[in-house]
């Protein structure tokens, strides 16, 4: 049976995951510093051609790549959240279904879908649970533009 602390920790981590998705979809990347990641976080978005680096490198990448002009709409739906608590740290695996609307040169938009997993480490801080390591793991893609080639 889960203790009250374990139940609370799981809910807090789930809220953190949903908060991350909301900030990404609203393009509030700077807020990731304050309320999602630890200062020393390491993030690996290479499964879909993104950056591998620290928090500042990741925020710079997001600000440059997920612009309103290029991606007017995105949605990151998290589910099948698996969390293994280990005191003040935890590990997790989170499914993400990610529809993306992309602007194309003729003025239209193109919608494609990404299926992925986030493989995470979490740490309890004075401000609450934060992600200390995140790695995207590709599961599948659908209807991506021909020029997009993602790592296997």
Describe the predicted segments one by one:
Residues 1-31, 35:
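Short, low-complexity N-terminal intrinsically disordered segments enriched in polar/charged residues
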Residues 3, 7, 49-52, 109:
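Charge-dense, low-complexity intrinsically disordered segments
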Residues 6, 18-19, 44, 69, ...:
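Residues at structural and domain junctions
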Residues 29-98:
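A solvent-exposed, acidic/Ser-Thr-rich amphipathic alpha-helical stretch
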Residues 15, 53, 117:
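Short, well-structured alpha-helical interface segments that form or flank functional binding sites
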Residues 67-152:
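A beta-strand edge to alpha-helix "cap/lid" segment located at domain peripheries
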């Amino acid at each position: 049976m889960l203790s009250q602390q374990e139940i609370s920790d799981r809910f807090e981590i789930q809220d953190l995951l949903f908060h991350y998705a909301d900030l990404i979809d609203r393009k509030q990347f700077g807020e990731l510093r304050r309320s999602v990641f630890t200062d020393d976080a390491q993030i690996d978005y290479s499964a879909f051609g993104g950056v591998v680096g620290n928090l500042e490198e990741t925020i710079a990448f997001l600000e440059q790549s997920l612009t309103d002009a290029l991606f007017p709409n995105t949605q990151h739906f998290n589910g099948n959240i698996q969390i293994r608590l280990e005191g003040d740290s935890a590990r997790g695996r989170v499914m993400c279904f990610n529809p993306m609307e992309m602007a194309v040169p003729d003025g239209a938009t193109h919608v494609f879908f990404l299926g992925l997993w986030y493989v995470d480490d979490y740490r309890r801080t004075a401000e609450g649970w934060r992600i200390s390591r995140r790695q995207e793991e590709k599961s599948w893609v659908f209807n991506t533009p021909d020029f997009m080639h993602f790592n296997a």
